[in-house]
Swiss-Prot record:
Organism: Brucella melitensis biotype 2 (strain ATCC 23457)
Active site (UniProt): 113, 250, 280
Similarity field: Belongs to the thiolase-like superfamily. FabH family.
Domain of life of the organism encoding this protein: Bacteria
Protein name: Beta-ketoacyl-[acyl-carrier-protein] synthase III
Length: 323
């Protein structure tokens, strides 16, 4: 059977780092207040000339180089983002141009913070269906451009950045010891869409709008939804939490991460945490955390890695991948 194997990985972050203390002159808050409630200490903020496309292209180049490939080897460019450069065309097409790719196809996918999980799952289907051999999966965001910088409950949470992987078709044996994606489960429930949203859009207000969130409601639902979809992935493969080498969750809030790991009985030392230095980078969150753990030598070939995310909609999902 065909498996979608991770061939390469890369990341990119804006130059500017904004620490919690930098907010003290803008809004009523403190480093202690932010760290205690979120675990975030700093985040990267896009500056002039830094966009979703430029960050996504930089992460993509790094992933392609890490894979030992050329841009011309890519069949599909799939970008997960909620902050595209333009309403249309897709920012994936712009990244395709930046990379000099003139073959295959490219499109954007929007599932907010779950975007990278949705994109990996979509890429896996294209690969196993024979429509693409190599897929460049990117999560890139510039959420700083849609924040209300007077709202202390949201503006301190988010950062900008991008991460990317190259998925490649490989022959597997149908075993959980195979390298590649072993299981993926996605969910959504539009009944919760008013709990996390942007209050604008071309078809309604003809503006971009700002991010709005009912933080307590999101927190209340997050742990249960995340663990349920992870359990579905375990059930599909016969694997358990004890088999996991590394848990790479969406980096939204350390309290949500800790509660999810505890409910799943995953040891703290197996959890990859980057929320302290990146903040919540939405669709870029999971690939940035992955890239960090690969770069520092934690995630190695053959490791079983659990990915998960939850975002506006609500959308949520989980992926089990053998590195």
């Amino acid at each position: 059977m065909i498996r979608s194997v991770v061939r390469g990985i890369g990341s990119a972050l804006p130059k500017r780092v904004m620490k919690n203390t930098d907010f003290e002159g803008i809004i009523e808050t403190s480093d202690e207040w932010i760290v205690q409630r979120t675990g975030i200490r700093e985040r990267h903020i896009a500056g002039e000339g830094e966009t979703t496309v430029s960050l996504g292209a930089a992460a993509a180049r790094a992933a392609i180089e890490n894979a030992g490939l050329q841009p011309s080897d890519i069949d599909l460019v799939l970008l997960a983002t909620s902050t595209p450069n333009n309403t249309f065309p897709a920012s994936a097409v712009a990244i395709q141009r930046e990379l000099g790719i003139t073959r295959g196809f490219a499109f954007d996918l929007q599932a907010v913070c779950s975007g990278f999980i949705y994109a990996i799952t979509t890429a896996d289907l294209y690969i196993r269906g024979g429509m693409a051999r190599r897929v460049l999966v990117i999560g890139a965001e510039t959420f700083s451009r849609i924040l209300d910088w007077t709202d202390r409950t949201t503006c301190v949470l988010f950062g900008d950045g991008a991460g990317a992987i190259v998925l490649e078709a490989a022959e597997g044996h149908g075993l959980t010891s195979d390298r590649g994606i072993l299981a993926a489960n996605l969910r959504s429930d539009g009944n919760h869409k008013e709990k996390l949203y942007v209050d604008g859009g071309p078809s309604t207000t003809q503006t971009v709008g700002h991010l709005r969130m009912e933080g307590r409601e999101v927190f209340k639902h997050a742990v249960g939804m995340i663990t349920d979809v992870i359990e579905a992935s375990f059930e599909a493969t016969g694997l358990t939490a004890e088999d996991i080498d590394w848990f790479v969750p969406h980096q939204a809030n350390k309290r949500i991460i800790d509660a999810s790991a505890k409910k799943l009985h995953i040891a703290e030392e197996k959890v990859v945490i980057t929320v302290d230095r990146h903040g919540n980078t939405s669709a870029a969150s999971v690939p940035l955390a992955l890239a960090t753990a690969v770069a520092d030598g934690r995630i190695k070939k053959g490791d079983l890695v659990l990915l998960e995310a939850m975002g506006g909609g609500f959308t949520w999902g989980a992926v089990l991948v053998r590195w």
